[in-house]
Amino acid sequence: MKNSKFIILKYFMLCILFSLAFSELKVGEPAPTFYIRTLEEKNFFMSDTLKHDKPIILSFFATWCVPCREEIPVLDSVRQEFPDIKFYLVDVSGLNTNGKAMIEDSLQVANMINYLKVDMLVLMDLYGKTAEKYAVKELPTLIVIDPEGKISYVHTGYTKGDENELISILNGYVNEKK
């Protein structure tokens, strides 16, 4: 009897772990809030940003990710077309707890951002907690949060032309506001 209870408990725990491993962010769900440091070492609270009733764009990237380096300047161009919409880059390059590696990662990110000549706030997800909350499994991952604070679009990867769908979505928000 004890053995069967143990097997049932073990099966139940396995089911929970399995479901967590395959969890994903779903369109229509509230955007997870988080606290994170910026590249400039300032505090950033997503909960404050969500209060502004405007769409928010999060792009999860890494310095070593080639499609990310292609997407970032394109996102910056799109950002310039939509000045009222907040765009944030979330760096996941240095997922470790080694202080030296974090400093090196910050320098690499700063160098990449300067090289690409983009003007977006960079958030440093050094421990991967934000990427985990947003179920990021592939880079780049682009997430659009609607003015009500809900996930409205999730896109992984980047190929030239992917930005057209983002522009269409953002135009919808701008036209809705008029």
Question: What residue spans do the PLM features occupy?
Answer:
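Positively charged n-region of N-terminal signal peptides that target proteins for export
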Residues: 1-10
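Bacterial N-terminal signal peptides
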Residues: 10-19
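N-proximal helix/coil linker or "cap" segments that precede and/or mark the start of modular domains
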Residues: 18-33, 107
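Short pre-active-site segment immediately N-terminal to redox-active cysteine/selenocysteine motifs
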Residues: 53-56, 61-64, 94, 138
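Hydrophobic beta-strand anchors of alpha/beta hydrolase catalytic cores
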Residues: 57-58, 87, 142
